Amino acid sequence: PSVSYTQLMGTRPYTFEYSTHAKILKDTSWIAEPNWIHIYYPYFDANVQLTYKPINSDSSVQDYLNDSFRLTGKHQVKATAIDEKILFLKNGNVASVSELSGEVPSPFQFHITDSITHFLRGALYFNMSTKNDSLAPAIAFIKSDLVHLLNTLEWNE
């Protein structure tokens, strides 16, 4: 598909540009918290789960970072490799991204924080069996969209 983006609208504590091939859906799971959303790609039947956490006196950014690495680490059983990178983004933010190889449920994950107020984690899932070799073109397309999301992310105060 061609590449074009639109601005996330609403009153969330974050905003970014996302693919016009995707739909924003509210997270309706029983554990969902305010400002958790899904970026759903109907063409690929893929979903990016975004979980937002405010950093406040009751929590710490270190707890959220540990949770993020722990959740990524759960895939080690099926992963043939986990490639972690730090991205220094055009908007001045810094993000950590993990690319997982093998028959893993989530081949791409990330987190980004300002270390003071905001923490956002994302994980890509496909609503089908994990045949990531055949999904490689879709994974690459969505990964590119997610890097664009990270480059355009702004925190709302």
Regions found by a protein language model. Give the residues of each.
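Generic detector of well-ordered alpha-helical segments enriched in charged/polar residues
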Residues: 15, 62-72, 143, 147-150
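Surface-exposed amphipathic alpha-helical segments
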Residues: 22, 123-157
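Residues that flank catalytic or metal-binding motifs in active/ligand-binding sites
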Residues: 18, 46, 149
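Conserved polar/disulfide-associated segments of primarily extracytoplasmic proteins
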Residues: 28-121, 128-132
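Extracytoplasmic/periplasmic, Sec-exported soluble proteins
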Residues: 6, 10, 14, 114, ...
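N-terminal "mature-domain start" segment
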Residues: 1-32
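Short glycine-aromatic motifs
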Residues: 22-23, 77-82, 153
